[in-house]
Amino acid sequence: MLKVLGIDPGSRFTGYGVVEWGGGKPRYVASGCIRVTGETLAERLRCIYLGVTQVVSMYAPDEAAIEQVFMARNADSALKLGQARGVAILAMAEQGLQVAEYSAKKVKQSVVGKGNAEKWQVQHMMQAMLDLQAKPQADAADALAIAVCHLHTQQSLMRIGSVSSSRRGRMR
């Protein structure tokens, strides 16, 4: 069973979501938010690093995925998001994980069916798709959606690979 960690990086909250592929669909394992504390930038980045490291140690995912940085109207916000993303990627890479990257548009398209979906729609779909009792917090829902998007992508690649292999076998 493939277990994936999704990360939604942020300078105040970093969402995480862990899902695995089981029974032909994504299955919920865990989700939550790392509350980013600290007065200085270095302290906040260290908080993200340690939090992601702890999540990886706790849930032992096979693969990881993170949202790509989008160019916000505020360059300072985009820079801070990029820094948060960087330490999250480092924390996962140091524990041997390959980290896939997906745009917010691709993630929303994968789980909601439209790339310009609202946050509440992502929350609703994660609740429905993963059979959750309640809507997950917005950052955790985004992280779950990133993990589900990665699972969908991996499953599609595996199907394409098996079709290609079977075609090659018939051509011989």
From Swiss-Prot:
SUPFAM superfamilies: Ribonuclease H-like. One of its GO terms (biological process) is DNA repair. Its EC number is 3.1.21.10. Mg(2+) 1 binds at residues 8, 139. Mg(2+) 2 binds at residue 67. It is found in: Cytoplasm. One of its GO terms (molecular function) is crossover junction DNA endonuclease activity. Its main location: cytoplasm. Its cofactor is Mg(2+). Binds 2 Mg(2+) ion per subunit. It holds the Pfam family RuvC. GO terms for cellular component: cytoplasm; Holliday junction resolvase complex. Keywords: Cytoplasm, DNA damage, DNA recombination, DNA repair, DNA-binding, Endonuclease, Hydrolase, Magnesium, Metal-binding, Nuclease. The active site is at residues 8, 67, 139. Gene3D superfamilies: Ribonuclease H-like superfamily/Ribonuclease H. The RuvA-RuvB-RuvC complex processes Holliday junction (HJ) DNA during genetic recombination and DNA repair. Endonuclease that resolves HJ intermediates. Cleaves cruciform DNA by making single-stranded nicks across the HJ at symmetrical positions within the homologous arms, yielding a 5'-phosphate and a 3'-hydroxyl group; requires a central core of homology in the junction. The consensus cleavage sequence is 5'-(A/T)TT(C/G)-3'. Cleavage occurs on the 3'-side of the TT dinucleotide at the point of strand exchange. This is Crossover junction endodeoxyribonuclease RuvC. The gene is ruvC.
